[in-house]
Amino acid sequence: MGIKKFKPTTNARRGMTQLDYSEITKKSPEKSLLESQSHTAGRNNYGRMTVRHRGGGNKRQYRIIDFKRIKDDVPATVKAIEYDPNRTANIALLVYADGVKSYIIAPKGLKVGDKVQSGSEADIKVGNALPLKDIPVGTVIHNIELKPGKGGQLVRSAGASAQLLGKEGKYVLIRLASSEVRMVLATNRATIGAVGNEEHELVNVGKAGRTRYAGQRPHVRGSVMNPNDHPHGGGEGKAPIGRPSPLSPWGKKTIGKKTRNKHNKSNKFIVRGRKRGRLGNI
């Protein structure tokens, strides 16, 4: 899809861009594949805030996505490419030969009328889902499973892709977009191709209201708070942090501090860690 620009009729319009949605072929979603979802505004079952900066936003219905792709050897036709308000990628409506309908994440290059299939015997073409052991080395993939039958968990956002680097026994090596190289069971499934809607990252929001539509509330800097509200707060005017390292509102090191558990059982599957920034070793 292309990027649509606006004339600077107001300050908010100046610089604002949005996707032109030229790839979208169907506006109304499939009713049988919808579920209602409630907005929690970052509150838990006690009503206490557990995640900051959430609330409001437009009402959405959840589209039931088939991340598992276990309907093997039954060809499906792409009936429509649709917008999904719950994710950055678009979704494709499939109609199987037996009449069953389902949604999948729309990969780059998938068009209405294309045929897709899942299973070990499927061809290596965009939109087909196969076990990793049946995918050739060097293939670009997305929607990768971490546990057999659980459904794709990795590489699902707009423009994302991973590459199959090699096969070692019952594992395969994949390189993620973060440059991390990871071992995954060869019996896990993945879908061929990269996720579509790659221009999503080029969109300029332009005004605060569009962020509020997404259910995000303002993120106030700690340096403008009082010292009883944040470790960075207080001082006369624009005061420095006054600490050796930036801290979270609860006094923990942040910005570059590794938050992954050192004893995480899946650490042994990471062959090479992702590249980190200047503060990556704090």
From Swiss-Prot:
Coiled coil: none
Stretches the record annotates as Disordered: 26-55, 218-266
One annotated Gene Ontology cellular component of this protein: large ribosomal subunit
Entry's Gene Ontology BP terms: cytoplasmic translation
InterPro entries per UniProt: NA-bd_OB-fold, Rib_uL2_dom2, Ribosomal_uL2, Ribosomal_uL2_bac/org-type, Ribosomal_uL2_C, Ribosomal_uL2_CS, Ribosomal_uL2_dom3, Ribosomal_uL2_RNA-bd_dom
Domain of life: Bacteria
Bias (Basic residues) ranges: 254-266
Keyword tags: Ribonucleoprotein, Ribosomal protein, RNA-binding, rRNA-binding
Pfam families: Ribosomal_L2, Ribosomal_L2_C
Bias kind Polar residues: ranges: 34-43
PANTHER family: LARGE RIBOSOMAL SUBUNIT PROTEIN UL2M, RIBOSOMAL PROTEIN L2
Function summary: One of the primary rRNA binding proteins. Required for association of the 30S and 50S subunits to form the 70S ribosome, for tRNA binding and peptide bond formation. It has been suggested to have peptidyltransferase activity; this is somewhat controversial. Makes several contacts with the 16S rRNA in the 70S ribosome.
Assembly, per entry: Part of the 50S ribosomal subunit. Forms a bridge to the 30S subunit in the 70S ribosome.
UniProt record similarity statement: Belongs to the universal ribosomal protein uL2 family.
Protein name: Large ribosomal subunit protein uL2
Gene: rplB
